[in-house]
């Protein structure tokens, strides 16, 4: 009996985590949330993607980064996937906050939902990006802190499917 339950559990697990081919290969667009940011996303295979982004954070400071994500289909909604992954980012506040010259580097996780429209070349997503600042250079000499306030709403034009 335990073997049958285990086999049913494994079959359910494998069916719910199976991946289908990605809905697109490459897209470009913008993110809003932790700044006004340009985003380029490309899939390396059916489930793994790189999101390279850069732009303007609050008060005109510069920011950028790269996220590596693994995508999983949500079987009940065509075109909807969830994703998780990790990455790195930087923020440069030099000169925009008056006397403060601030540079920050962080490592981050990411988790989100992504929807790709079937009939138009558009993809939208929302994500949460908790970040641990591993280097910070400013007048206050703070190091290693948690930033739980990063995330974004993204819209991208699909360049090729």
Across the structure, where does each feature detected by a protein language model lie?
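Extended interaction regions within the primary functional domain
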Residues: 126, 131-135, 144, 149
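Gram-negative (and chloroplast) outer-membrane scaffold detector with strong preference
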Residues: 42-126
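Short glycine-rich beta-strand segments
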Residues: 31-35, 85-93, 110, 129-135, ...
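Outer-membrane beta-barrel "beta-signal"
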Residues: 146-161
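Flexible, surface-exposed loop regions and adjacent strand-edge segments
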Residues: 102-104, 141-147
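Short glycine/proline- and aromatic-enriched beta-strand/turn motifs that initiate or cap beta-hairpins
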Residues: 20-63, 160
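Bacterial Sec-dependent N-terminal signal peptides
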Residues: 1-24
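Extracellular loop and loop/strand-boundary signature of outer-membrane beta-barrel proteins
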Residues: 25, 53, 96-99, 138-142
């Amino acid at each position: 009996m335990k073997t049958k339950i285990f086999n049913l559990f494994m079959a359910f697990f494998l069916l719910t985590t199976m991946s289908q081919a990605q809905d697109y290969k490459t897209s470009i667009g913008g993110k809003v949330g932790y700044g006004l940011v340009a985003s380029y996303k490309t899939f390396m295979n059916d489930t793994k993607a790189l999101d390279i982004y850069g732009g303007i954070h609050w008060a005109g400071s510069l920011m950028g980064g790269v996220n590596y994500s693994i995508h999983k289909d949500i079987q009940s909604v065509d075109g909807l996937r969830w994703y998780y992954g990790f990455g790195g980012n930087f923020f440069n506040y030099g000169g925009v906050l008056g006397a403060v010259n601030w540079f920050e580097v962080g490592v981050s996780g990411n988790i989100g939902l992504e929807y790709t429209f079937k009939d138009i070349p558009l993809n939208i997503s929302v994500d949460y990006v908790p970040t641990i600042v591993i280097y910070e250079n400013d007048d206050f000499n703070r190091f290693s802190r948690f930033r739980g306030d990063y995330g974004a709403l993204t819209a991208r034009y699909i360049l090729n499917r």
